[in-house]
Design a protein with these regions (language model features):
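N-terminal signal peptide c-region/cleavage motif recognized by signal peptidases
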Residues: 16-18
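Positively charged n-region of N-terminal signal peptides that target proteins for export
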Residues: 1-5
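Conserved functional micro-motifs across diverse proteins
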Residues: 21-185
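Bacterial N-terminal signal peptides
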Residues: 6-14
Length: 185
């Protein structure tokens, strides 16, 4: 793998090199429900701007995405049953009870199309996102980025819903906060 790509990925996910497997990532937030694990790391403006600029986005085009409250998520099915999840069913809930949905990758893609972002950059964006709908067989996992539709101040919780043969379930990540870095000020 290209060392620059690996270094940017490490920066975005907050991991130390060398990266060998998903288990090597130092996740800041992690929760488990049954055999399903959800992990998250907040992402700052500078890291997302650098990541997507290196993939063909003009700085002004990627700015709204980079300024949004964003995370790198990992989800793993450690069980034997198939499960599914839809990003549209996930919510961030502030301490005041205000719920904010996650902005779906297709919504960002519409914005990129209107801004005439090159197709190659848009493909790179889609590949780096937590997919809008996922089906996990036993042992499957996914990593990807996602943003909130609107910022929440202070800490909040993320309620991630998924479905398996036993019904609907939720995993809750508590005490999340939007990532901040010196470039965001």
């Amino acid at each position: 793998m290209n060392i620059r790509l690996l270094a940017v990925f490490a920066l975005l996910t907050g991991i130390s090199l060398p990266v060998r497997a998903e288990g090597d990532i130092e996740w800041r937030h992690r929760a488990t429900q049954g055999a399903v694990t959800l992990s998250a790391n907040p992402l700052g403006l500078a890291s997302r701007t650098a990541f997507y600029s290196a993939r063909g986005f003009a700085a002004e085009a990627i700015r709204p995405y980079a300024q949004a409250c964003g995370f790198s998520f990992g989800m793993q099915n450690g069980g034997t049953a198939t499960l599914s999840t839809r990003l549209a069913d996930w919510r961030a809930v502030g301490t005041d009870g205000r719920a904010v949905r996650l902005r779906l990758p297709a919504e960002w893609d519409l914005q990129w199309a209107k801004a005439h972002v090159p197709e190659a950059a848009r493909i790179a964006f889609r590949w780096a996102q937590f997919q809008a709908e996922n089906v996990f067989e036993a042992g499957d996992w996914i990593m990807g980025m996602a943003t909130l539709e609107a910022p929440l101040s202070g800490s909040f919780r993320l309620v991630a819903r998924y479905h398996d043969e036993k019904g609907n379930h939720e995993i809750v990540l508590d005490k999340l906060a939007c990532g901040h870095d010196s470039s965001a000020n």
